[in-house]
Design a protein with these regions (language model features):
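Rossmann-like dinucleotide-binding cores of NAD(P)H-dependent redox enzymes
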Residues: 7, 12-16, 22-87, 91-92, ...
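FAD-site-proximal beta/loop scaffold in flavoenzymes
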Residues: 1-11, 95-169
Length: 173
């Protein structure tokens, strides 16, 4: 996973990154700069949707120019460990292989066992809360949510700030 990925003892010759979110793109560009052959796979047809489309178009051009094989709209159907490499089969039938695989398709908050229906809160299909983005208050007064349980961007720094805003609002400060 992305937390332990940098502890590897040697740099791979090739890398597949599944997930073109902030973390996946960061690792893909970092390893590409180290002359690693990188394939970045994203099941959606777009990526980093919270960034201006014009900037993303230019960024897409630059990372491809730097050697990243960007595969948008490509979902993974199967993963096989072949010993000296990993082989992925995509839903379109194409195969991709590399020495190493990084799964960076995001984190999901552990909300399924919270029993939120008991207080009248519903979660979306990914187990996320709907909140007021100015206060991080849910539809139920006095219940707030921040970080991975509300969706993108799921970054520690962003989550920390969301938590601060929610706490200030909850305490009326």
């Amino acid at each position: 996973d992305s937390d332990e990925f940098l502890e590897m003892s040697q740099i791979p010759r090739s890398l597949i990154v599944v997930g073109a979110g902030v973390i996946g793109v960061e690792y893909a560009t970092m390893f590409s700069a180290l002359d690693v052959k990188v394939t970045l796979i994203e099941p959606r047809k777009t990526f980093l949707d919270f960034i201006d489309r014009t900037l993303i178009q230019e960024f897409t051009h630059q990372i491809r120019e730097n050697g990243v094989d960007l595969r948008l709209g490509s979902a993974v159907a199967n993963i096989e460990d072949k010993g000296d490499h990993v082989q992925l089969e995509l839903e379109n039938g194409r195969q991709v292989q590399a020495e190493m695989l990084l799964f960076a398709a995001g984190r999901i908050g552990a909300t399924e066992k919270l029993g939120m229906e008991a207080v009248g809160l519903e979660l979306d299909h990914r187990g996320r809360f709907s909140v007021d983005r100015k206060t991080y208050q849910t539809d139920v007064p006095n219940i707030y949510a921040a970080g991975d349980v509300i969706g993108h961007p799921s970054l520690a720094s962003t989550s920390l700030q969301q938590g601060r805003v929610a706490a200030c609002h909850a305490l009326n400060t």
